[in-house]
């Protein structure tokens, strides 16, 4: 940019040489300024007068320089001033160009001396402010847009915060609910009777998971360790009652231990201790003795209801193993319903707590009911190991179809359900007895364990039939120990605990 201040000395009329040299310089400056003035709109016709030593457009250079200088000095005031000094003729020509300029930029003409010299750059800012007086500065910043934006941001921020307060409003009824109601609701969804865990016979023998699980159920139903009144029994006592002899570590229980075998052993132990009970298959969707018509939803309802009571115990037959369900938890799907009560079935996910008799596994398993249903509904040659769900579906060498896995239920029966048995047996004495040759003893009658005194009251015929039934049971046990076994366990049990 040309420096106009350096050429002020050319205005001295005494130096003719300098005046002759400055004349062509003025013409060049005029041509340059003319190009700036007519750029964008040809609104003014500027001709170079002879008496005009410097063009009016030269202060544009100072305007750009002064703009940044004054902005730095008045930064805290958010104001800036563009200064220039021009003649009256230039003011008239510049007034015509104001329509083409922006409304935010205004030029202020300063009345100083009559000489056409540019405002002195070394003048102090204090003298500048005194000359301006009360006139507004040329450069002002409009903050209205910023204020509207900040107000919009505040409003939008308030709108975003309103949804966060909605969960608090919904949570108010939970706070107002009595504490005992919340406790009762949680108890219905989280069930674990510690007595069932106390009765788990752990550890087991190498392959005695079947009899160990059965002893666990029996102790819970009939012993003082659980919900009964009899002394608890051990695995060794139960094996002795069933006719097994030590050493028990050498017995291979796998080949002759099946679902029906456990139910028969349960009846024999009950007969030995003169207690009443029954056993049945709760849920077995495929294979022999399947529960036709039973669904997974119905089986889950019966299982959870039975675990809340103390009159029923369960055994779960899974891949090469038996163990006992002892509790459950109905976990809500949504976190906001952790302490809600009376949830719908689709709002919860059931987990079954299973006691483990083997010391090689955790003492309590927690398995999804959906995984248990998958295990029970898988048919050969596919199988699903519930204790190793990470392995997924696996295959074994066996014939297609069927599945031995199931849920077994063992229930304690009270004497009152069958009436006063001692009085009923006493009234049977005067009744005439049919001859021994023509009378057949029903199976249900032979399974009821009656004391020796009651046998004498019933007569010699009943006593003889009862002894025949016991002899038949012993023969069955001997055959099972020789390896004939249960047909259910031949293709399932591999000798692992």
UniProtKB/Swiss-Prot annotation:
Feature: compositional bias, Basic and acidic residues: 442-451
Basic residues bias spans: 152-169
Top-level taxonomic group: Eukaryota
Subcellular localization, as worded in the UniProt entry: Cytoplasm; Nucleus
Region (Disordered): 1-24, 150-173, 426-462, 478-497
Keywords in alphabetical order: Cytoplasm, Nucleus
UniProt entry tagged with the keyword Nucleus: yes
GO cellular component: cytoplasm; nucleus
GO molecular function, one term: single-stranded DNA binding
Major localisation: cytoplasm
PANTHER family recorded: BASIC IMMUNOGLOBULIN-LIKE VARIABLE MOTIF-CONTAINING PROTEIN, DNA REPAIR PROTEIN COMPLEMENTING XP-G CELLS-RELATED
Recorded family membership: Belongs to the BIVM family.
Protein name (record): Basic immunoglobulin-like variable motif-containing protein
Native source organism of the sequence: Xenopus laevis (African clawed frog)
Taxonomy of the source species: Eukaryota, Metazoa, Chordata, Craniata, Vertebrata
């Amino acid at each position: 940019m040309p420096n106009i201040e350096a050429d002020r000395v050319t205005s001295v009329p005494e130096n003719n040489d300098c005046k002759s040299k400055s004349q062509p310089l003025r013409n060049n400056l005029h041509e340059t300024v003319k190009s700036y003035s007519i750029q964008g709109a040809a609104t003014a016709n500027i001709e170079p007068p002879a008496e005009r030593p410097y063009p009016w457009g030269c202060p544009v250079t100072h305007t750009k320089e002064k703009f940044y200088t004054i902005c730095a000095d008045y930064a805290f005031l958010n104001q800036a001033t563009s200064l220039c000094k021009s003649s009256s003729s230039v003011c008239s020509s510049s007034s015509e160009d104001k329509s083409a300029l922006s409304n935010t930029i205004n030029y202020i003409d300063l009345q100083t001396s009559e000489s056409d010299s540019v405002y002195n750059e070394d003048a102090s800012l204090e003298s500048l402010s005194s000359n301006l007086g009360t006139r507004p500065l040329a450069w002002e910043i409009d903050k209205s847009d910023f204020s509207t934006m900040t107000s919009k941001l505040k409003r939008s921020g308030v709108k975003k915060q309103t949804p966060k307060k909605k969960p608090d409003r919904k949570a108010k009824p939970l706070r107002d609910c009595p504490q005992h109601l919340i406790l009762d609701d949680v108890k219905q969804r989280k069930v674990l009777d510690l007595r069932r865990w106390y009765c788990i016979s752990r550890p087991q023998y190498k392959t005695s998971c079947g009899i160990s699980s059965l002893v666990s159920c029996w102790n819970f139903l009939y012993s003082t360790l659980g919900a009964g009144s009899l002394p608890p029994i051990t695995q060794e006592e139960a094996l002795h009652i069933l006719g097994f002899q030590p050493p028990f570590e050498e017995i291979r229980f796998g080949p002759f231990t099946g679902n029906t075998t456990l139910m028969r052993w349960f009846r024999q132990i009950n007969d030995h201790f003169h207690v009443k009970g029954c056993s049945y298959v709760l849920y077995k969707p495929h294979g022999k003795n399947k529960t036709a018509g039973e669904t997974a939803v119905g089986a889950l309802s019966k299982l959870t209801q039975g675990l809340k009571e103390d009159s029923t115990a369960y055994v779960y037959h899974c891949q090469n193993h038996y163990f006992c369900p002892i509790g459950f938890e109905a976990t809500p799907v949504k976190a906001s319903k952790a302490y809600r009560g009376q949830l719908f079935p689709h709002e919860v996910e059931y987990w079954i707590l299973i006691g483990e008799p083997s010391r090689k596994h955790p003492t309590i398993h927690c398995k999804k009911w959906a995984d248990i249903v998958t295990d029970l509904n898988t048919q050969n040659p596919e199988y699903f190991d519930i204790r190793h769900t990470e392995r997924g579906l696996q295959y074994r060498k066996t014939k297609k179809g069927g599945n031995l896995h199931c849920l077994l239920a063992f229930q304690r029966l009270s004497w009152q359900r069958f009436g006063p048995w001692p009085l009923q047996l006493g009234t049977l004495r005067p009744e005439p007895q049919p001859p021994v040759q023509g009378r057949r003893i029903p199976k249900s009658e032979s399974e009821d364990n009656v004391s020796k005194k009651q046998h004498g009251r019933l007569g010699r015929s009943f006593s003889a039939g009862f002894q025949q039934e016991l002899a038949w049971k012993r023969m069955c046990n001997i055959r099972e120990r020789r390896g004939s076994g249960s047909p259910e366990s031949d293709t399932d049990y591999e000798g692992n605990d």
